[in-house]
A protein has these predicted regions:
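Solvent-exposed, well-ordered amphipathic alpha-helical segments
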Residues: 33, 66-69
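Surface-exposed patches in mature extracellular/periplasmic domains of secreted proteins
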Residues: 53, 69-75
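Amphipathic alpha-helical segments that form the core helices of the histone-fold
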Residues: 56-66
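An acidic, gly/pro-interrupted, aromatic-rich
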Residues: 1-45, 49, 75, 80-90
Length: 90
């Protein structure tokens, strides 16, 4: 986002978290390795494959411990839906 209040609203809203959890569930359904869930998420959100660096960082993040009641894949989804690449069309 381009403004701090907008970014904070998107990151902290219940709607964004609900959508992130739904996206994580959709990407996890039927995906064997964690990497496939990440690839699905990128395809759905950005219509492209993740770069090697994006894939490495995402796998590292998803493999880490969860914080609170939100699983790491849902946290990743929340972060990705708040990227400018998702919010704005070039």
């Amino acid at each position: 986002s381009t403004t701090a209040p907008q970014s904070l609203l998107l990151l902290n809203s219940g709607f964004s978290l609900t959508m992130a959890k739904s996206l994580a569930g959709l990407c996890q359904a039927g995906a064997a390795p964690a990497g496939e869930s990440v690839r699905r998420m990128y395809r759905l959100l950005f219509q492209r494959e993740p770069s090697r660096e994006e894939m490495r960082l995402a796998r590292q993040f998803v493999a880490g411990p969860s914080s609170g009641d939100v699983e790491p894949l849902a946290q990743l989804a929340l972060a990705l839906i708040n990227l400018n690449e998702f919010l704005f069309v070039d």
